[in-house]
Structures are given as C-alpha cells and as structure tokens.
C-alpha cells in the first residue's frame, strides 16, 4: 500500500450510480454528469465559484443508464448528451433556465429503440460530418446510428460474451475485446450492413477478461486494454507493445494528457486496483502511486476550473463520487529529522527495565490475558412430529438445533457451515449480527433426507467471521428418535454386533423409553422414509446385547446409542465388544470388485466413443463427396454403437453410486471399530472420517495411519533393529556352522 494518498476536494454520494462523464456545456470548462441504475441523470458543476457541490439539474428517466457520451451528434447543435439504456439510445440537449447559468434542464430530442438489450457503445468520429455512435448488444451484434438515422443494425460478431469496444480514426479500425480475445475489424466492412459474420483482420488471446479499452490516435496509434490481472498495449498490426502485470485486480483505467509536458510519444494512464490503489504510468513505467481510500470502478481526469486542472474524478461501487488531486505528504508517518541525537546509554537502560518487567510478568503467569474470541454453544431444541421441507423423507420428524453465540462484539456477519449426513434446509447459513449486540442465536432444523440415508447422527457446526478471521467449531449428536421409528424385529438379519457387559442386562423398553415397545428383550427400529431396519436383542444368561441388521451402516449408530444409554443407566459398568473385521474384509472385496468392473466400463466407453466419432467422420465425408449409398449402413452402425455407449455410461454411473455406498458402509465400520476399541481404552486413528473426506486411495490412507498411529513398543523395536548391531539379550543366536551340523 502506498504511503501517499489522494487529497479529497469535492465528494458526494448518489445511490445506485452506474457511470460518470465529463462534458463541457458552457464557459469552456468541464461539468460532471452522473448516471444511475434507477434512471437518474445529475449534472453537477464542481468548478462553480460559490460552492463545489453545485448541481445544475437532475432528471429522472424510466430506464437504467449503461453509458453516456457528449459530442456534436446533430448538425447545428453543440454538446448533445447521448444516453445508452438497455432498450434505448436517447439524445438530450442542455438548456439553461437562468441567465447566470446556475440552473439547467435536460430536454429529450429523440431516441432509438432496440429489440435486443444493449451492452455498451463507442463514438465513431467522422471527418467533416457529425460523429456516429456504434452500439453493441448483449448477443454481440453491432448497430450504427448517425443522428436520427440508423446506418445499419444487428451486424453479428463471432463471439458469445460481449466486451469493451473502441475505434481508431487514424486506421479506421474497430477493436472488440469479446470472449477474452482482442480483434481488429476494418470499419469499411460493416458499412454495407450485411448480416453475415465479419472476419477479423487479426486477433489476440488476452488470457483474461477485458474490463476497459482505450484507443490513442496519432502516427503510432495504440490500443490499450485493461484486464483483471494485466494491462496490455497493441499497435495497429496486433503486436504487443508493452504489458503491465497487476498485483491486485484491475478495476478502472483512464488516459490523460499532461498540461506541462506536450509529448505525445508516451501514453499516460491511471489504473485503479481492488486494494484501493491508484497507479500512474507512462506507458509501462510506474511514475507514481497513491492510496485512493476506495476501490474506484470509474476514473476521469477533468479540468473543472483554472485553479483545479487535471483533477482526478473517481466513482465507488456504493455511489460515492470523489474529485481530488494527488498529495505529496505521507499520511502514515513522518521520518525523524537528521539532527536528533540518540543517547544510546539511556536507551540500553530502558530496554533492560522493559526486559525485566517482561520476565516478572511471565513468572507471575503473564499480565496479558488471551482473548477468547467468539463463543458458540449447541443445544437440542424442539422435536416436531413432521417436517414440511421438500428434501425430507416421508413423515420424517424434525429437530431444531439451537446455535447460540456470545462475545460477538464488532461482528456484523457470521458464516455458518454445516457438516451432517442428516438433511437441513441449507448447508451454509449467513447470520447477521447487530453491531450493538454481544449475543446472537439461530435455530437450524435437521431431519432424514429423501435422497440419502444417514449413517450417523453427528452434526458439526463451524462459524467463521471474515472480519476477525476467527473460526469456532462444535459437534453434537441428534436424538435417536429423529432418525428412527419403531418397527418389527428381524432375527434373521445377516450382519451382527455383540456388546458384552459385566453386569446383568437392562430391559430394552426402559433403555429406549421414548418408544412404545413393551418387550424388555427385543426392539426393532426402521429409518424414516425407508425400509432399512435394525433390531436390538438382550440375553439375560450371557449378559449380552446383540444388534442385527441387513444394512452395515446402521450397526454403528445403533451400537453407539445403546452403549451410551447403558453407561447412563449404570455408571461405572464395564462394556466391551468384538470388532467385526470379517465385515470389513467383505466390504473391501466388494469395493475392489466394483472398481474392476468400473475400469472395464471406462474402457468400453472410450472404445465406443472413438467408434461413434469415426462413424460421424465417415458420414460427414460421405455427405461432402456425395456418396450417399452407404448412409443406411452407417446409420445402423451408429445406432448400435450409440446404444452400447449409453448402456456403458449407465452401468458406469450405477457402479459409481454402488462404490460410494460401499465406501460409506466401510467408513461406518471403521467408526464402529473405533468405538469398540475405545471401550477397551484403546484410541485409534482409524475412525469413520480418516478416509471419508480425502481423494486418496484406501491403501495410501492406511500407510499414513500405520506411520502415524504406532505404539511405543513398535518404535522401540524399529530403532533397535536399525541402530543396534549387537546380539539381543536373553535370545540365543546360533551360528551358521552349528545350524549346518544339526542339519547334517
């Protein structure tokens, strides 16, 4: 950021401002014309002798204003104001209502209407005639107007996205920067008004989105294009003259002439960037920069009176218009004078005293307390019987999660991200906080979705403040009843998990008291909106609980809920379980088999795609040569190949969905293994999320887990084997000769 700043002379804020223009309507000095999105046109006179904020006139139109231009567009009439709107091009004349020229009015002369919305325009100067206006529509078609006549209309360009346009009178060339390409067109080609697409003389790939274009006249005309990340200059033949790389995003650009140096060899330009900086260049040489204290989207260099010539006029996105000039005094600090004498002995004593205070403060625990930042609390709110959200399962209940924030002073907005397998109206929420409030809260409903069945009831909330760059994250488990409802038990389910306890089993109808079951030894649950069921059984003789289901993904969430309820009902009881490694191996085998089939389908898709393209090429060649006899055979072959291609793509998508479901089941088994290991007081890194949110293969993740989650015993053995050439104690190692004798 520059140390120098722009000194403000005149400023005013007009809401919904879209464009600004400097034009001379009287007294051989310039006035400022401001156009708005609401159709308002304001003509102000900053160089007025009494007040700088003097407004000549304000006119309301019915259309949003895109661009304005001022010139002698009509014969025998000077300084006509041309206003471009999405549907009209309107000409206005300025009439003064008072003899002292302090008040004026805008009178509409005539207008041209468009059938397609306009995008921008440029002025085409004509020797010994009135200037013309070239308008580009939103679909990249050009229309030329001269006064009240339309020369031609809707001439198409070879582009889809409109961009800046400019005209060079010296070479009579039109420049367009559409689709990220700068192209040159001879203006004489468009004089016929043909509806055929026009060929370019030359084109250049800018590699970025063009924002603004300026064209300079003279013996060496130059086209200067401002893009988001660079400024490029081109000569008449399309060669790059120079280029400037911007450190921030470019916002606006304007050219100007120096009042003291009359040298047309160089181009002088001002570029504004998104980091509130104005860059003043002489061609590609940076001669000055300053802090604009705003990010201008429009720039002008105007002379409003003889006292303030070549002042800079800027327009901000919020409608603030500032007229100022470059300051030469740094606004951050001033360098000390060279005559200041520093007493180094006193400075050293001062540093020693400060160091002693810091040591005493550290010994006492520190005098500076760490700022806690934003505090977040999660709690379960109302549980409703049925939600009306469109993405919810049929007859699914909802649960409101209350998110409470505290210590949010000076925080205006919080970005909340939601991570949960349960559905909600939105995964991203923006919470607006009042500036005078220190607390805020929001309720977010959760329910079972209609597209994806959840395998976990865990909800993670992350709140981020863009201003302070602070982020807080909390997690909570949704109630079990939000996901499941009571159903019939299934004793013949394929997948089982056993939970052992040191004490007698507890009645299941008491553990799950919110359900209406009266059976103390068996209870069944089904996921809302689906036929997925899970059953829980209690065995009094063996003091065990058994969980059975046809869906692996339901074992983990049910076992976790069961263990939590047992621990709450009987504190201190020992609980354990057997990790189902055979289910993991079975799921891994199925994933590998599906991935093999997916690779075969991918090869088949590539083969059929090449075959379809070859048939299309043969068909086009036959049409060009006129050999139409083999078209029925090619049509039949194309139909067969295309159907096989569609079948292979359907199979590929189906296998991809199956692989994702199997991966979700495997992640659930990993979390189940982590939960059962934790019951035995063994923490492991292999949980349900260590592979879920990565793009790595399972083999790579397991390698990382083995290196990361190793016990001290394995580390000791590894170090001993790598660095100890001695024999291990208490282990008899026989020599090779003795082994050979025993073998003989």
From Swiss-Prot:
Positions of region (Disordered): 722-744
GO biological processes: cilium assembly; protein transport
Organismal lineage: Eukaryota, Metazoa, Ecdysozoa, Nematoda, Chromadorea
Quaternary assembly: Part of BBSome complex, that contains bbs-1, bbs-2, bbs-4, bbs-5, osm-12, bbs-8/ttc-8 and bbs-9. Interacts with bbs-1.
Presence of keyword Protein transport: yes
Any Gene Ontology CC annotation: ciliary basal body
Short name of any one Pfam family annotated for the protein: PHTB1_N
Transmembrane region(s): none
The keyword Protein transport is assigned to this record: yes
Bias (Basic and acidic residues) ranges: 722-733
Disruption phenotype annotation: Mutants have normal body morphology, but with reduced body length and width, delayed larval development and decreased roaming movements. Defective cilia structure and function characterized by an increased accumulation and mislocalization of intraflagellar transport proteins and impaired movement of intraflagellar transport proteins along the ciliary axoneme. Disrupted assembly of the BBSome complex at the base of the cilia. Defective avoidance of nitric oxide and P.aeruginosa.
Protein name stated in the entry: Protein pthb1 homolog
Domain of life: Eukaryota
Biased composition (Acidic residues): 734-744
Alphabetically ordered keywords of this record: Cilium biogenesis/degradation, Protein transport, Transport
InterPro entries for this protein: PHTB1_N_dom (IPR028073), PTHB1 (IPR026511), PTHB1_hp_dom (IPR055363), PTHB1_pf_dom (IPR055362), WD40_repeat_dom_sf (IPR036322)
Functional note: Component of the BBSome complex. The BBSome complex is thought to function as a coat complex required for sorting of specific membrane proteins to the primary cilia. The BBSome complex is required for ciliogenesis but is dispensable for centriolar satellite function. Required for proper BBSome complex assembly and its ciliary localization. Required for cilia biogenesis and both the assembly and movement of intraflagellar transport proteins along the ciliary axoneme.
């Amino acid at each position: 950021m520059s140390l120098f700043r722009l000194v403000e002379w005149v400023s005013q804020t007009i809401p919904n401002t879209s464009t600004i223009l400097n034009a001379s309507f009287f007294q051989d000095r310039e006035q400022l014309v401001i156009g708005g999105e609401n159709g308002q046109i304001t003509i102000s006179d900053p160089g007025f002798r009494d007040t700088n904020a003097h407004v000549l006139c304000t006119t309301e139109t019915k259309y949003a204003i895109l661009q304005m231009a001022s010139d002698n567009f009509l014969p025998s009439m000077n300084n006509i104001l041309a206003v471009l709107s999405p549907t009209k091009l309107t000409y206005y004349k300025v009439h003064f209502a008072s003899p002292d020229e302090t008040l004026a009015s805008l009178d509409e002369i005539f207008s041209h209407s468009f059938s397609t919305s306009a995008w921008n325009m440029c002025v085409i100067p004509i020797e010994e005639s009135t200037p013309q206006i070239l308008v580009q529509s939103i679909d990249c078609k050009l229309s030329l107007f001269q006064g009240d006549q339309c020369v031609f209309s809707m001439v198409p360009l070879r582009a889809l996205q409109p961009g800046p346009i400019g005209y060079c009178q010296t070479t009579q060339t039109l420049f367009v920067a559409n689709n990220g390409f700068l192209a040159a067109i001879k203006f004489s080609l468009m004089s016929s008004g043909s509806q055929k697409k026009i060929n370019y003389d030359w084109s250049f790939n800018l590699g970025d989105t063009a924002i603004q274009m300026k064209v300079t006249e003279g013996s060496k005309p130059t086209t200067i294009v401002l893009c988001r990340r660079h400024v490029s200059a081109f000569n008449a033949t399309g060669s790059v003259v120079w280029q400037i790389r911007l450190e921030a995003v470019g916002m606006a650009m304007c050219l100007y002439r120096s009042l003291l140096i009359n040298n047309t060899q160089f181009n002088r330009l001002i570029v504004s960037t998104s980091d509130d900086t104005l860059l003043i260049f002489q061609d590609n040489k940076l001669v000055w920069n300053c802090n604009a204290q705003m990010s201008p989207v429009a720039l002008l260099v105007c002379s409003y009176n003889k006292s303030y010539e070549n002042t800079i006029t800027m327009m901000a996105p919020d409608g603030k218009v500032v007229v100022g000039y470059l300051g030469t005094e740094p606004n951050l600090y001033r360098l000390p004078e060279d005559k200041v004498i520093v007493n180094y002995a006193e400075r050293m004593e001062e540093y020693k005293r400060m160091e002693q205070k810091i040591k005493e403060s550290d010994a006492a625990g520190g005098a500076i307390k760490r700022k806690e930042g934003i505090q977040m609390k999660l709690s379960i709110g109302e549980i409703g019987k049925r939600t009306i959200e469109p993405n919810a399962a049929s007859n699914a209940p909802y649960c409101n999660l209350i998110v409470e924030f505290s210590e949010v002073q000076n925080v205006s907005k919080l970005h909340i991200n939601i991570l949960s397998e349960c559905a909600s109206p939105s995964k991203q929420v923006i919470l607006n906080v009042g500036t005078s409030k220190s607390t805020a809260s929001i309720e977010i409903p959760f329910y079972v979705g209609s597209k994806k069945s959840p395998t976990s009831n865990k909800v993670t909330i992350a709140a981020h403040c863009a201003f302070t760059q602070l982020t807080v994250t909390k997690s909570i488990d949704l109630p079990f009843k939000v996901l499941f409802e009571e159903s019939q038990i299934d004793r013949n389910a394929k997948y089982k998990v056993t939970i052992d306890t040191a004490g007698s089993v507890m009645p299941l109808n008491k553990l799950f008291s919110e359900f209406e079951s009266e059976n103390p030894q068996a209870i069944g649950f089904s996921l809302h909106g689906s036929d997925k069921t899970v059953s829980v059984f209690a065995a009094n003789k063996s003091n065990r609980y058994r969980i059975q289901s046809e869906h692996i993904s339901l074992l983990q969430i049910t076992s976790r809920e069961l263990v939590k309820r047992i621990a709450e009902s009987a504190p201190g009881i020992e609980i354990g379980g057997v990790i189902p490694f055979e289910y993991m191996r079975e799921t891994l085998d199925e994933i590998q088999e599906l991935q093999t089939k997916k690779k075969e389908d991918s090869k088949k898709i590539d083969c059929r795609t090449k075959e379809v393209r070859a048939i299309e090429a043969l068909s086009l060649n036959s049409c060009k040569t006129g050999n139409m006899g083999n078209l029925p055979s090619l049509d039949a072959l194309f139909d067969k190949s295309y159907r096989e291609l569609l079948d292979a793509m359907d199979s590929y998508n189906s296998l991809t969905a199956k692989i994702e479901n199997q991966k979700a089941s495997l992640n659930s088994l990993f979390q189940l293994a982590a939960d059962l290991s934790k019951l035995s007081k063994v923490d492991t890194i292999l949980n349900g999320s260590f592979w879920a949110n990565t793009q790595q293969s399972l083999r790579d993740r397991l390698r990382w887990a083995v290196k990361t989650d190793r016990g001290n015993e394995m580390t000791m053995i590894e170090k001993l084997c790598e660095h100890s050439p001695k024999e291990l104690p208490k282990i008899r190692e026989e020599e090779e000769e003795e082994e050979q004798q025993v073998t003989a």
